[in-house]
């Protein structure tokens, strides 16, 4: 349970009562407005208390769990993604159109299944559709566009790489997920990553489904059969990202800063050059509103780099002609302009802005212009994130703790110390009420 309390000076005791046979439970205590989780898996409980205002608490937390390294500046621009480009030519053609139209773009993303006939996440490009990945990356770089690709911690056991992994006993039992808790498995994964993917000089890495997706680890022993999987399941994404980040810092051929997008996280993951996003979400207004509050909640956990799939991951079948959806997409995009990371993505969708008509394209262009005009501010604030333990996207309570009404603002937030962001979260609105928080310090 997390709770904000004011304590008088002196000694305070915390009493925790637990039973060996408790079942994992998550519930809301209406009387005290608390969310409570308890689990029989943990063998002990440790409490750490951070004192000070919100900024001081966050800085202390990062000092304890590790500072967030500086993001490359291009990671703070526009990242364009869709599910998915199917060929090398298709990806390059869309990148060229961005440049021809003068729509700002820093990074384009190749989602899953570029491995084709070689099997899931075989760490190879299927040359039938991607005949020359090295040339593909080179052409993107000539256009001053970076490339990110999707890489999983799941590997097809029938692939050449999967057979090697399986023969060495590097899988979590009865799954296709690599046992990153086993140092030998983690090192072998990185060895293949380094040899098969790093030579292409790809810029960013999308570690998808790092929960791991769909497979419970209960009754599955990990780390060479020495630990129960359910004990450390939630820590899995931390180990995956640690392996890749440390490898990139050691072996990247150009010595570049690492940028990793991971779907799942754990305390301290910010020290591995990661950003997270809210996963495969819907596209309706309620989903949009929930993403904002969810993102602000994530900011409050000390993980500073976050985004969502602007426009929603699952989209309506008539998305290109549906004007109601166009309005909604615009609101998603406008709001994401003031997120730590700005990214569009969509399931089975050609998400390029020109596919939605001139009006949507022009509004996207306008807000990208705003984003890039803000980039010196964003980059300066990102330095404060790294060196001072600051937070870029901030719930109002972080800056206006004396204003009780600020705590009730679910969707308004500060973007750095200077910008108050007020998303429009309902349809057919030409005006919108803004809450201006009280600041007793002027």
Features from the language model and the residues they span:
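Catalytic-domain carbohydrate-binding cleft regions of carbohydrate-active enzymes
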Residues: 1-442
């Amino acid at each position: 349970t997390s709770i904000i309390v004011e304590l008088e000076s002196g000694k305070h005791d915390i009493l925790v009562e637990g039973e060996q046979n408790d079942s994992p439970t998550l519930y809301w205590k209406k009387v005290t407005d608390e969310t409570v989780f308890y689990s029989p898996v943990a063998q002990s409980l440790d409490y750490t208390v951070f004192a000070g205002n919100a900024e001081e608490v966050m800085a202390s937390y990062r000092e304890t769990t590790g500072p967030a390294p500086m993001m490359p500046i291009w990671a703070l621009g526009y990242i364009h993604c869709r599910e998915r480009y199917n060929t090398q030519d298709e990806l390059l053609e869309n990148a060229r159109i961005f440049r021809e139209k003068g729509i700002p773009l820093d990074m384009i993303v190749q989602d899953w299944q570029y491995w084709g006939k070689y099997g899931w996440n075989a760490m190879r490009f299927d040359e039938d559709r991607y005949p020359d990945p090295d040339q593909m990356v080179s052409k993107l770089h000539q256009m001053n566009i970076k490339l990110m690709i999707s890489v999983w911690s799941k590997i097809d056991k029938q692939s050449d790489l999967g057979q090697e992994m399986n023969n060495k006993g590097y899988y979590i039992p009865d799954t296709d997920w690599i046992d990153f808790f086993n140092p030998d498995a983690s090192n072998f994964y990185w060895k293949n990553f380094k040899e098969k993917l790093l030579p292409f000089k790809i810029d960013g890495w999308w570690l998808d489904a790092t929960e791991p997706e769909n497979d419970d680890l209960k009754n599955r022993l990990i780390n060479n059969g020495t630990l129960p999987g359910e004990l450390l399941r939630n820590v899995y994404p931390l180990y995956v990202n640690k392996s890749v980040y440390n490898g990139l810092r050691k072996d990247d051929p150009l010595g570049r800063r690492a940028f990793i997008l991971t779907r799942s996280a754990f305390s301290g993951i910010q020290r591995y050059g990661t950003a997270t996003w809210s996963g495969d979400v819907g596209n309706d207004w309620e989903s949009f509103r929930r993403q904002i509050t969810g993102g602000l909640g994530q900011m409050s956990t000390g993980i500073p780099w976050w985004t969502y799939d602007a426009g929603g991951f699952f989209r309506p079948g008539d998305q290109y002609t549906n004007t109601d959806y166009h309005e909604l997409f615009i609101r998603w995009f406008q709001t994401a302009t003031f997120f730590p990371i700005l990214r569009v993505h969509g399931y089975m969708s050609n998400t390029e802005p020109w596919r939605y008509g001139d009006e949507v394209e022009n509004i996207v262009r306008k807000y990208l212009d705003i984003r890039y005009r803000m980039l010196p501010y964003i980059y300066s604030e990102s330095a404060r994130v790294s060196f001072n333990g600051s937070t870029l996207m901030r719930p109002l309570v972080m800056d206006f703790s004396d204003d009780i009404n600020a705590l009730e603002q679910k969707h308004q937030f500060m973007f750095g110390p200077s910008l108050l962001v007020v998303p429009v979260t309902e349809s057919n609105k030409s005006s919108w009420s803004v809450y201006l928080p009280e600041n007793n310090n002027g």
